[in-house]
């Protein structure tokens, strides 16, 4: 989908932390790109085959909390199961009483020989400098992770 977004995501300088800005023509696309940006800090997602599916359902009463839980869940999957996500993510974001994400992540077990190591291990998600906003015809999600 075409829109005026500058890029899918980019990184900013931050001491002992990494600032990530993820973009999307839709809020769903921005959340997908936020996941890919997180993974790319550790390994090359384009080398991950979508061999296995992991279903994730999360909710929160605001978008900032939803973003925090989304990234935190991805960190948990990598830390506990060494599940490397591919760029294939099916994501449905909506709102009933609360905001929710129902997603299917495709990937496979992390293999340093196959997926590489890009130099960083993400330790935790933070609320520091978090921002979610619509800019003209695209969305920007900004968040900071501890490395």
Swiss-Prot record:
Which SUPFAM superfamilies does the UniProt entry name for this protein? MTH1598-like
User: What GO terms are given for molecular function?
Assistant: calcium ion binding
Biological process, per Gene Ontology: tRNA splicing, via endonucleolytic cleavage and ligation
Write out the residues that bind Ca(2+): 17, 146-147
Keyword tags: Calcium, Metal-binding, tRNA processing
Q: Is the Calcium keyword given for this protein?
A: yes
TM spans (from-to): none
UniProt keyword annotation of Metal-binding present:
yes
Q: Which PANTHER family match?
A: ARCHEASE, PROTEIN ARCHEASE
| Functional description taken from the UniProt entry | Activates the tRNA-splicing ligase complex by facilitating the enzymatic turnover of catalytic subunit RtcB. Acts by promoting the guanylylation of RtcB, a key intermediate step in tRNA ligation. Can also alter the NTP specificity of RtcB such that ATP, dGTP or ITP is used efficiently.
The UniProt entry's sequence similarity note says: Belongs to the archease family.
Tell me the protein's name. Answer: Protein archease
Which source organism? Pyrobaculum islandicum (strain DSM 4184 / JCM 9189 / GEO3)
């Amino acid at each position: 989908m075409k829109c005026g977004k500058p890029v899918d995501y980019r990184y900013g300088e931050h001491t002992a932390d990494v600032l990530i800005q993820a973009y999307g023509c839709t809020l769903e696309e921005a959340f997908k790109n936020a996941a890919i940006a997180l993974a790319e800090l550790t390994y090359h997602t384009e080398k991950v085959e979508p061999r296995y599916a992991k279903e994730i359902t999360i909710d929160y009463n605001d978008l900032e909390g939803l973003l925090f839980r989304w990234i935190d869940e991805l960190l948990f999957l990598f830390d506990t199961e060494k599940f490397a996500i591919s760029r294939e993510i099916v994501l449905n974001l909506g709102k009933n009483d609360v905001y929710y994400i129902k997603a299917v992540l495709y990937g496979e077990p992390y293999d340093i020989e196959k997926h590489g190591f890009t130099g960083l291990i993400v330790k935790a998600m933070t609320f520091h400098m978090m921002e979610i906003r619509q800019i003209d015809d695209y969305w920007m999600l900004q968040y900071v992770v501890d490395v």
